[in-house]
Protein backbone atom coordinates (compact mmCIF):
# COMPACT_ATOMS: atom_id res chain seq x y z
CA UNK A 1 0.00 0.00 0.00
CA UNK A 2 1.35 3.42 -0.96
CA UNK A 3 2.17 5.88 1.78
CA UNK A 4 0.10 9.04 1.96
CA UNK A 5 2.21 12.04 0.95
CA UNK A 6 3.24 14.01 4.01
CA UNK A 7 3.01 17.74 3.70
CA UNK A 8 6.19 19.70 4.32
CA UNK A 9 5.52 22.12 7.15
CA UNK A 10 6.73 25.65 6.62
CA UNK A 11 9.33 26.54 9.23
CA UNK A 12 8.11 29.42 11.36
CA UNK A 13 10.65 32.19 11.85
CA UNK A 14 10.68 33.35 15.43
CA UNK A 15 10.52 37.09 16.05
CA UNK A 16 13.39 38.45 18.14
CA UNK A 17 13.74 42.16 18.88
CA UNK A 18 17.05 42.12 20.80
CA UNK A 19 20.15 40.27 19.71
CA UNK A 20 23.86 39.89 20.35
CA UNK A 21 26.41 40.38 17.56
CA UNK A 22 29.56 38.36 18.17
CA UNK A 23 32.46 39.71 16.08
CA UNK A 24 35.55 37.50 15.98
CA UNK A 25 38.30 39.51 14.29
CA UNK A 26 41.47 37.51 13.76
CA UNK A 27 44.46 38.60 11.71
CA UNK A 28 43.34 36.40 8.79
CA UNK A 29 39.52 36.57 8.79
CA UNK A 30 36.48 38.14 10.46
CA UNK A 31 33.46 36.11 11.60
CA UNK A 32 30.20 37.89 12.50
CA UNK A 33 27.50 35.85 14.27
CA UNK A 34 24.18 37.35 15.37
CA UNK A 35 22.39 35.43 18.12
CA UNK A 36 19.34 35.92 20.29
CA UNK A 37 19.67 36.67 24.02
CA UNK A 38 20.04 32.96 24.85
CA UNK A 39 22.91 32.51 22.38
CA UNK A 40 21.03 30.65 19.63
CA UNK A 41 22.50 31.67 16.27
CA UNK A 42 20.16 33.59 13.96
CA UNK A 43 22.64 34.48 11.21
CA UNK A 44 26.35 34.47 10.53
CA UNK A 45 28.77 35.57 7.82
CA UNK A 46 32.52 35.56 7.29
CA UNK A 47 34.85 37.69 5.24
CA UNK A 48 36.01 34.57 3.38
CA UNK A 49 32.44 33.45 2.72
CA UNK A 50 31.61 36.90 1.37
CA UNK A 51 33.86 36.36 -1.64
CA UNK A 52 37.21 37.62 -0.34
CA UNK A 53 40.17 35.27 -0.59
CA UNK A 54 43.79 35.51 0.47
CA UNK A 55 45.07 38.78 1.87
CA UNK A 56 41.86 40.65 0.91
CA UNK A 57 40.03 38.51 3.46
CA UNK A 58 41.85 40.28 6.31
CA UNK A 59 40.80 43.83 5.39
CA UNK A 60 38.35 46.17 7.14
CA UNK A 61 36.19 46.29 3.99
CA UNK A 62 35.79 42.50 3.97
CA UNK A 63 34.66 42.66 7.62
CA UNK A 64 32.19 45.40 6.69
CA UNK A 65 30.65 43.26 3.93
CA UNK A 66 30.43 40.26 6.27
CA UNK A 67 28.65 42.34 8.94
CA UNK A 68 26.19 43.69 6.34
CA UNK A 69 25.37 40.16 5.13
CA UNK A 70 24.82 38.86 8.66
CA UNK A 71 22.67 41.91 9.43
CA UNK A 72 20.41 41.39 6.40
CA UNK A 73 19.52 37.87 7.50
CA UNK A 74 19.03 38.96 11.13
CA UNK A 75 16.56 41.64 10.02
CA UNK A 76 14.27 38.88 8.73
CA UNK A 77 13.97 37.71 12.35
CA UNK A 78 12.93 41.21 13.43
CA UNK A 79 16.15 42.14 15.25
CA UNK A 80 16.33 45.87 15.94
CA UNK A 81 18.65 46.27 18.95
CA UNK A 82 22.11 44.75 19.06
CA UNK A 83 24.65 44.27 21.80
CA UNK A 84 28.12 43.84 20.23
CA UNK A 85 30.77 41.50 21.66
CA UNK A 86 34.14 41.97 19.96
CA UNK A 87 36.86 39.35 20.25
CA UNK A 88 40.35 39.40 18.75
CA UNK A 89 42.94 41.90 17.51
CA UNK A 90 42.13 41.89 13.78
CA UNK A 91 41.57 44.75 11.35
CA UNK A 92 37.80 44.14 11.14
CA UNK A 93 36.95 45.12 14.72
CA UNK A 94 35.78 48.67 14.18
CA UNK A 95 34.51 48.45 10.60
CA UNK A 96 32.11 45.61 11.40
CA UNK A 97 30.55 47.64 14.23
CA UNK A 98 30.20 50.65 11.92
CA UNK A 99 28.57 48.45 9.26
CA UNK A 100 26.01 47.09 11.74
CA UNK A 101 25.24 50.64 12.86
CA UNK A 102 24.83 51.80 9.25
CA UNK A 103 22.56 48.81 8.51
CA UNK A 104 19.95 50.34 10.81
CA UNK A 105 20.52 48.44 14.05
CA UNK A 106 20.46 50.30 17.36
CA UNK A 107 23.67 49.31 19.14
CA UNK A 108 23.02 49.28 22.88
CA UNK A 109 26.54 48.52 24.11
CA UNK A 110 29.92 47.31 22.89
CA UNK A 111 31.96 44.86 24.95
CA UNK A 112 35.51 43.63 24.32
CA UNK A 113 35.66 39.93 25.22
CA UNK A 114 39.17 39.24 23.88
CA UNK A 115 40.67 36.45 26.00
CA UNK A 116 43.78 37.63 27.85
CA UNK A 117 46.03 34.84 29.19
CA UNK A 118 47.35 34.95 32.76
CA UNK A 119 50.71 33.82 31.32
CA UNK A 120 49.37 30.73 29.57
CA UNK A 121 50.69 29.39 26.26
CA UNK A 122 53.78 30.79 24.59
CA UNK A 123 52.74 33.31 21.90
CA UNK A 124 53.79 32.92 18.25
CA UNK A 125 57.21 34.27 17.32
CA UNK A 126 57.41 37.86 16.09
CA UNK A 127 57.17 38.38 12.33
CA UNK A 128 60.25 39.49 10.42
CA UNK A 129 59.22 41.03 7.10
From Swiss-Prot:
InterPro entries: Ribosomal_uS11, Ribosomal_uS11_bac-type, Ribosomal_uS11_CS, Ribosomal_uS11_sf. Keywords: Ribonucleoprotein, Ribosomal protein, RNA-binding, rRNA-binding. GO terms for cellular component: ribonucleoprotein complex; ribosome. Gene3D superfamilies: Ribosomal protein S11. GO terms for biological process: translation. The keyword Manganese does not apply. One of its GO terms (molecular function) is rRNA binding. Located on the platform of the 30S subunit, it bridges several disparate RNA helices of the 16S rRNA. Forms part of the Shine-Dalgarno cleft in the 70S ribosome. Belongs to the universal ribosomal protein uS11 family. NCBIfam families: PRK05309.1, uS11_bact. Part of the 30S ribosomal subunit. Interacts with proteins S7 and S18. Binds to IF-3. This is Small ribosomal subunit protein uS11. It comes from Tolumonas auensis (strain DSM 9187 / NBRC 110442 / TA 4). The lineage of its organism: Bacteria, Pseudomonadati, Pseudomonadota, Gammaproteobacteria, Aeromonadales. The gene is rpsK.
Amino acid sequence: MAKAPTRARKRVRKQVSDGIAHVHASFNNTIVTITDRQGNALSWATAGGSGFRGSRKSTPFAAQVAAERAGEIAKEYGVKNLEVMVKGPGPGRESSIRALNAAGFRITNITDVTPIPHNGCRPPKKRRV
